[in-house]
Regions:
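Class I SAM-dependent methyltransferase Rossmann-like catalytic core
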Residues: 22-34
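Conserved alpha-helix/loop element of class I SAM-dependent methyltransferases that forms part
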Residues: 34-52
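Class I SAM-dependent methyltransferase SAM/SAH-binding core
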Residues: 55, 61-103
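A short acidic, Gly/Pro-enriched loop at the edge of an enzyme's catalytic core
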Residues: 102-113
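A short SAM/SAH-binding and catalytic strip from SAM-dependent methyltransferases
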Residues: 112-126
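A short, conserved alpha-helix within the catalytic core of class I
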Residues: 123-135
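Conserved catalytic/acceptor-binding region of the Class I
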Residues: 133, 137-213
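Conserved Class I S-adenosyl-L-methionine
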Residues: 190-273
Length: 273
């Protein structure tokens, strides 16, 4: 076990085996991935009776952890990739660690809120749920009003801009990149429906990500897709070049500066221990 202390980031390096599809583009991932709406976190925080400890599992670049740090005394932000953790933003009350979702060093019944953003479909669900039940705070008849800890998982689907641009996006996503998507991507495409979730279900309002982006910002995001990187590795060519001219024409004049509203639907599962 190696502990690396740097810029207030506590990185616990452990030998782990997992599908690492994003570490090679960790810096791009950190800068180009869409930001989740603050209203989503406000909703989740309103569900927990205590705000002592949150665990952001598979934190990636730490985006969700940063939001949680505004509400909780302490946040544990973990990921199986030390490259992702190395690009996370430090915060005084965030402790970044490297360990798999299914095997943690967290204490029993210690976590008030577990969040899993854009990652649950990668986990060994049986092992992860067992670990989540172990670390989630158990309900009691005291200060928590009989309510236990909360677990929330969400993913966002394919973005939408306009009918014309969306047609080009689907050409890239399905026809060009279709064979290069991992099998787990289908779980997101199915909106997490049918995925086991052995917790007391909590109904959630609808959330979506809305950002005003230039074409270059959107292209930067698309380059973080694992399927794009797999296509490049296998074919030694850039799949985005196949659709770029059509996409630029559909975007309109001054593609660098002109902003368009980009929307991603969010699919959520929220429950209580």
């Amino acid at each position: 076990l190696i502990i690396v202390l740097c810029n207030k980031i506590n990185v616990t390096l452990k030998p782990v085996q997992f599908k690492d599809l994003f570490s090679s583009k960790s810096k791009e991932y950190a800068s180009s991935r869409p930001k989740y709406p603050k209203s989503l976190f406000e909703f989740l925080v309103g569900l927990v009776p205590r705000r002592n400890l949150a665990w952001d599992c598979a934190t990636g670049n730490g985006q969700a952890a940063l939001f949680l740090s505004e509400y909780f005394e302490q946040v544990i932000a973990s990921d199986a990739s030390h490259e992702q953790i190395a690009n996370a933003q430090p915060r005084n009350n965030i402790r970044y660690e490297v360990f798999p979702a299914e095997r943690t060093n967290l204490a029993d019944s210690s976590v008030d809120l577990i969040t899993i953003a854009q990652a649950l479909h990668w986990f060994n669900l049986d092992d992860f749920y067992k670990e989540a039940r172990r670390v989630l705070r158990k309900h009691d008849n005291g200060g928590d009003g009989g309510r236990g800890g909360v677990i929330a998982a969400w993913a966002y689907g394919l973005h939408s801009v306009s009918a014309q641009i969306d047609t080009i996006t689907h050409l890239l996503y399905e026809d060009i990149l279709g064979p290069y998507w991992p099998e787990e991507r289908k779980i997101v495409e199915n909106r997490y429906e049918g995925m086991p979730f052995p917790f007391h279900k909590i109904e959630t309002p609808g959330f979506q990500i809305e950002l005003d982006w230039s074409l270059s910002e959107l292209i930067g995001y698309v380059y973080t897709w694992s399927s794009v990187q797999k296509f490049i590795e296998k074919n030694n060519s850039d799949p985005i070049k196949q659709i770029y001219n059509d996409l630029a024409a559909a975007w309109g004049e001054n593609q660098i500066r002109h902003k368009r509203r980009v929307v991603w639907p969010i699919y959520m599962k929220v429950g209580r221990s």
